[in-house]
């Protein structure tokens, strides 16, 4: 998983073409997904697009969480090459397991490859008080009840839309 942002009108047009193709050719459970090969095959490259690493859900984050740091380095170089001066290592602090280790290793990669970092939030619900309602919705979608001790816990209470001040406080230890 990688987050693409439009940097310019050219980037908007490119992303529109990629998403249109994904809707026509590559849907997974009704969700359009852009294939990495399409980014490599595009004549104008990725000009006009900014890429964020995807934090724990991106290839780099997954490699770090699997303790495969050499692979994480290879992936970091690949994405940095594909998005020159437009690839950011994404950092999140939302209460998931191994979060501190993931942030630390992500910072190591950012320093090693001279990449900027960006603090983001994996927002799943609007307000902090909406967590329980969100969990109920997730249980309904997955066929569980809230009291089921075996149900997956994929979300945390911290995944609400934080204010700028909350994000600044959360990442105050980083530049």
Q: Locations of the language-model features?
A:
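Phosphodiester-processing cores and adjacent nucleic acid-binding clamps
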Residues: 1-175
